[in-house]
Amino acid sequence: MIKQYFKQALAQLRQHPLISVISIAGTALSIFLIMLVVMLQQVKVAPFSPESNRDRFLHVHYMSISHKDWGDGTSNGPMSVRTAREIYKSLKTPEAVTIYCSMPVSTPVSLPAMPAIGADVRETDDTFFKVFDFRFVNGKPYDEATFNAGTPVAVITESISRALFGSTESAGKEFLLNHAPYRVVGVVKDVSTLADASYGQVWIPFTSTDLPNDTWSDQHMGMMSVTILARSHDDFGEIRAEAKRRMSEYNSILADQGYTLIDRNRPYDQETQSISFAANLEPDLKSARRERAIIFIILLLVPAINLSSMTQSRLRQRVAEIGVRRAFGSTRMEMVGQIIMENLVVTLLAGAVGLFISIVMAYLGTDILFAQPYSATLNAPTVDSSILLHPSTFLYALLFCFCLLYTSPSPRDC
């Protein structure tokens, strides 16, 4: 029966090629637009390596500090290593807490007597590679002993390894980082710039440089950010409460100097962090969600309403056919079943076209569509299927269009 319905649906589409093409194109447009908008949002919050645990991340990229002599003024930016350790590294509830430089810095890397190339270097602690799941192709990350000793070692990407050594098998080899010798301990898959917290091309221990001394406000502010890996999303409330207590305790120590650290309700989860652009402003998550919902509704409703009208018109053209078939014994359920199948065929064909166009557009327009408003690197963002494709989103959009196509016929039409 279903096979027969399917054949009849295809035959009906061939009988009205213009209407069929317009219906498929309109539904494909709706799928294309909603998928493209969702992709733009998903790259900010959806998990992909090396940030596969985004649903368990809490971030403290920046904070503010005030002083009794500054009035209402504040100093805003990343924190110092000391502040990060005193407040966040000491937390007991999370699975892991990593401290790292808030942004990568373009630095020359080379081999002796060879021309240098630019690489984005991020300085981290050893826990960084426990929080972020890098895919190692050679070697391994530096461990706690190496980090504490300040040994000049580095983890590099495949592209940097090939540029320097001609292959990805470079663990144990040495190169010059800003004219200082470093030894490669591991090689990882290239990381997209869309992985904002973990992106880099070279990662080194911040104990191997003088970065911890790059501070201000009496060593309370500096160049460091923190990412917390919770054991479960359910622990977020407890982690935030513990962080508040540690902040309060630390501020009581700073009171003698006249300073007060301000977290602005940090740490933020991944979704909140994705819309946070300033250290001294707390993002409005409800407003951002409301704006996205309005955009989604508009993108879905405008094409769908037009398609619904077209389906209604097509059914009215078939009133005589429906009457004859009812007169010869066709039941209401059989007629409704055929209408549903016709709409399902249209939706599936249009969905495949819309999904294909959205993926092609995302790949071809990566530099424009996924360009970050604030970025410390000149490297263009890269995307792959693990970043772009989320079947649940496509299925929801497909179901929505199908429902709107189906709801156009009224019972009296059958």
Where are these regions (language model features)?
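Mid-to-C-terminal secondary-structure elements
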Residues: 125-141, 152-282
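Hydrophobic alpha-helical transmembrane segments of multi-pass inner-membrane transport and secretion
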Residues: 15-44, 283-320, 348
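Conserved transmembrane alpha-helices of multi-pass membrane proteins
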Residues: 372-405
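Membrane-proximal extracellular/periplasmic loop immediately following the first transmembrane helix
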Residues: 37-108, 115, 222-225, 372-382
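A short amphipathic helical element positioned immediately N-terminal to and/or at the very start
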Residues: 5-14
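The feature marks short, hydrophobic/small-residue-biased sequence motifs that occur predominantly
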Residues: 101-103, 110-141, 147-148
